[in-house]
Amino acid sequence: MTELPDSYDPNSIEPKWQDEWQERDVYRFDPSESDTQYVIDTPPPYPSGNLHLGHALGWSYIDFVARYRRLKGDAVLFPQGWDCHGLPTEVKVEEVNDIHRTDVPSDEFREMCIDWTEDRIDEMKATMQELGFSQDWDSEYRTMDPEYWGKTQESFSEMADAGMVYRDEHPVNWCPRCETAIADAEVENIDREGTLHYVTFDGVDNGDIEIATTRPELLAACVGIVVSPDDDRYADRIGDTFEVPLFGQDVELLADDDVDADFGSGAVMVCTFGDKQDVEWWMDHDLDLRTVFTEDGHLNEAAGEFAGLAIDDAKTQVAEELDDQGYLNDTEPTEQSVGSCWRCDTAIEILSKEQWFVEVDQDRILDAAADAEWVPEHMHDRLVEWTEGMDWDWVISRQRVFATPIPAWECNECGHWEIAGREQAPVDPTEDDPAVEACPECGGDDWAGETDVMDTWMDSSITPLHLSGWPEGTTLDEFESVDLRPQGHDIIRTWAFYTLLRTGALTDEQPWDDVLVNGMVFGEDGNKMSKSRGNFVQPDEAIAEYSADAVRQALALGGRPGSDVQFQWKEVKSASRFLTKLWNITKFSTGHFDEDTPAIQDPAYRDADRWLLSELSTVCEDVDEAMSEYRFDRALRSLREFAWEDLADDYVELVKGRLYNGRPGERAAAEHTLYTAVTAVTRLLAPFSPHTTEEIWQSLPGTEGSVHAATFPSVEYRDADAELAGKRIAEVAREIRAWKSDQGMPLNADLDRVELYFDDSDDDAARLDTYDLSETVNAPIRLIDGRPDVELVPVDVDGDDSEIGPEFRSDAGTVMEAIAAADPAAIQAQIHSGDTVTVEADGESFDLDADWLTVTEEYRASSGEEVTVIEASFGTVIIYE
């Protein structure tokens, strides 16, 4: 037990405990320490180096759960991973070093990515530790380490053996900036204004036709024209042939139900490919494939004189040439939604490429998702909507460098692909040979290692398997779902979707029991945080201004899980004030504790004690229920209300007399009650404010080890009668203290007596234990049934000289004297009977507006004594000074 410092100083407390926890391995996962384990599938973030408030919200939720589950007796695995691979890192390294990845050898570029990533991880870890997150750093993993990406390769091989991975040519989303295929989930639609071009196609042995397109640069790739079968304008022209302007190929007019006859001219050219709709028409009508775009976003030789132009430049020049040759009839602006690369915002193209794919089994994904508990429930709908909308398999190959190598080799003689066995992982096919010497198809021995790498979601989608100990400690058949997947709603269509897909495909099990979804953090102005808007706040800025514990509370109170949270400085300030209040209450309380306090036997509790313990029992149950339902806002609000109002403002004030002047037994009861409440509140608050509660815990007698290794408080002392009695005692004490303050009286000023009148004569609470109340208000207390016999008597009249002066001028003084000398009761009677009051002075009458007069009233008891009357929830309080 250590002495609590006089003042709350988070700047010294928080770093001290962060170091202490790490040195003592307080959060190390040891499954042998408990019969129950709780495993959290923590998000492995992209290590940008910038741990923003959105991260802080998500990881605060995770930490609340982890600390709560430890208090409940579980051995908790709270790991931390880092999703290192992929486009974000490569793009950043290219930007920082002002290079393109092809400017340096692949191995050198990969090392640059690793070095940059390691530095960013260190930065993010430092902020995580400043916020007091309780990861088991012995369970840290990085997807760029061979120990991890070897598992990704093993899972790839398992799925390939099961026929769920294949290589084929198929249209794919392609980013010209990043020069790689990307999955549907990595395409983000951006709304912008485009231009609709009305272009004439000359007929071949038939009349002309006008089509409408926003992409004239794709004319070289045009392989057909489609119209609605219900469009009367073209009903008799289906099958006609037309020549594509500038490029000369012939195309046929086709009917298709997906055409919107009201858009443009109603005739649409089919190109390979402008968008996914083009792909569907191309496949449905078995059209030719004409590729005109290069991987880096230029037109190829098939575009003739426009070859070599960037796509945007080609759009402009082709439109100009159409106009010059008389094919362009008109243009008009149009709103369009353009698919763009999630990382660089470049408009994606659709190219037909030979790639690696993973089969998407929608039914299995939906079944596994339905078996999980989604918090909030409507987030499950997002997953369902995305899954049901999937129309392509998952393209997993990427034409990049910094990612998990695809473990496969191509036979240069027959084209057979040999996939590595699980036992070969981790393997780099660009450096290592396949396990077989001869090709099983043709017997050849000339192999080329696959240079494509995997989508980074192939890494992070096996996190539940990694946490289960696969493949070293468990088999896929033995896999059991982990307890919790916490994540943001923005990656439901990626991380959640791909994990459901991969875990289901590999184990036929759901990956997790619960999915806890957090929203985004917005600025104080309600807008998305942005430096340009001036509403951007970094976690370390808020920590420096107040404390990590205060920031965590503010995030908890921001709203229920799944909802977006508006960051508000006032909430952080309020949390800081609460922590200071709790500190001061604890400091006061520990002054009355000693080593024997926890062991006090059979305390002689009074009503105030029983009331607080009963309220505490309710709070413990409420917090437990709220935490189990992930309602951190509700749990913290309930706890703060009890600690601030019931414990600090009411109970402590009620029992100060007993603590200082009470008999030993009475004093011991108050001490034990206070000890029970403070130790319980400390543990209940520990998930939210770990540093402050740890410091407080160490100052309390009878405690051992860390508060974060303690047990969740269970205070079984429910007493409805005591709760009612205590609430009334506290209410009266609170009202009298407020009245004394308003009167400018010292709070310890003696009063003649206080009478409590109870409206309900059968109210058992009329027999209150008034000892603590009497000590608190410094007055004898009488309990009386019924209503008090008091009367409100007018005792003084005051005139408004700002009205009377101008009205009566030289007589104003005489009128004011007459008002002062008048009978207040008579004046009040005139006010009640009309709008005018008459006063007399020196034999003269003066008429005044009733609004110019104020009558002061006082309560008088039947004895004639002046009293103060306070209406209470149970009846009336009468104060005799």
Curated annotation (Swiss-Prot):
Binding positions for ATP per the UniProt entry: 531
Give the residue interval(s) assigned to the motif 'HIGH' region: 45-55
List, alphabetically, the GO terms of the cellular component aspect: cytosol
This enzyme's EC code(s): 6.1.1.9
- Tell me, what's a Pfam family for it? tRNA-synt_1
Task: Please indicate which superkingdom the organism of origin belongs to.
Answer: Archaea
User: Which reactions is this enzyme annotated as catalysing?
Assistant: tRNA(Val) + L-valine + ATP = L-valyl-tRNA(Val) + AMP + diphosphate
Q: What is its main location?
A: cytoplasm
Q: Does the record's keyword annotation contain Iron?
A: no
Motif extent ('KMSKS' region): 528-532
Q: Which InterPro entries match?
A: aa-tRNA-synth_I_CS, aa-tRNA-synth_Ia, Anticodon_Ia_Val, M/V/L/I-tRNA-synth_anticd-bd, Rossmann-like_a/b/a_fold, tRNAsynth_Ia_anticodon-bd, Val/Leu/Ile-tRNA-synth_edit, Valine-tRNA_ligase_type_2
Drop me one GO molecular function for this one.
aminoacyl-tRNA deacylase activity
**What is the annotated localization of this protein?**
Cytoplasm
Q: Choose any GO biological process term that the UniProt entry carries and state it.
A: valyl-tRNA aminoacylation
Keywords noted in UniProt: Aminoacyl-tRNA synthetase, ATP-binding, Cytoplasm, Ligase, Nucleotide-binding, Protein biosynthesis
Quote the entry's note on domains: ValRS has two distinct active sites: one for aminoacylation and one for editing. The misactivated threonine is translocated from the active site to the editing site.
**NCBIfam families per record:** PRK13208.1, valS
Job description of the protein:
Catalyzes the attachment of valine to tRNA(Val). As ValRS can inadvertently accommodate and process structurally similar amino acids such as threonine, to avoid such errors, it has a 'posttransfer' editing activity that hydrolyzes mischarged Thr-tRNA(Val) in a tRNA-dependent manner.
Write out the similarity annotation: Belongs to the class-I aminoacyl-tRNA synthetase family. ValS type 2 subfamily.
- According to UniProt, the name of this protein is Valine--tRNA ligase
Q: Which organism is it from?
A: Halobacterium salinarum (strain ATCC 700922 / JCM 11081 / NRC-1) (Halobacterium halobium)
